[in-house]
């Protein structure tokens, strides 16, 4: 969604993912150079591979060292870098932090790993530039209001938008 909007604005985005448990996670690599897919789904990991299929003109890179991936993305012509699951990654400067909140389990049992699903405590939400409520079409108005109240506690003026999943 964000990459598509950037493309419409004339930007050249690239997506950088860790590629967790993929064949390329440790050494890193280019899944797609924005022209063709260069590795298998097993090497890329499921999500990066699906992103490369869905966004054929957008470079997709994976690897634990996201600084290396970022440099490769810029070398491929990217002028905007989108980090998949990058909120808690501090190795790169950023202009915006967009946090996705799943309306079906919005706050990961309110605890960080291993007790809950959060990568950081909820107080980290104060750094967010934008909240996107995913699957908001499946949540009731009352559920969305509860989520927004929690988000307002941490990001008082941070914009909150709803999104819906579609095939």
Which residue ranges define each predicted feature?
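A conserved segment at the C-terminal end of the G1
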Residues: 1-16, 20
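Phosphate/Mg2+-binding loops and adjacent switch elements
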Residues: 11, 20-155, 162
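Beta-strand-loop-alpha "switch" segments that mediate conformational coupling across diverse proteins
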Residues: 160-167
């Amino acid at each position: 969604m964000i990459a598509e909007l950037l493309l419409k604005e004339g930007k050249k985005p690239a997506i950088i993912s860790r590629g967790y448990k993929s064949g390329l996670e440790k050494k890193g690599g280019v899944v797609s150079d924005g022209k063709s897919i260069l590795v298998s789904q097993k090497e890329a990991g499921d999500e990066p591979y699906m992103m490369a299929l869905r966004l054929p003109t957008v470079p997709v890179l994976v690897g634990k060292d996201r600084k290396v991936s970022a440099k490769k993305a810029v070398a491929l012509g990217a002028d905007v870098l989108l980090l998949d699951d990058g909120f808690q990654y501090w190795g790169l400067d950023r202009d915006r932090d967009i946090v996705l909140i799943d309306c079906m389990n919005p706050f990961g049992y309110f605890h960080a790993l291993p007790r809950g699903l959060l990568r950081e405590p909820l107080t980290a939400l104060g750094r967010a530039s934008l909240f996107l409520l995913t699957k908001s079409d499946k949540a009731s108005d009352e559920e969305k209001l509860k989520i927004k109240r929690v988000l307002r506690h941490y990001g008082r003026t941070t914009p909150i938008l709803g999104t819906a999943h579609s095939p």
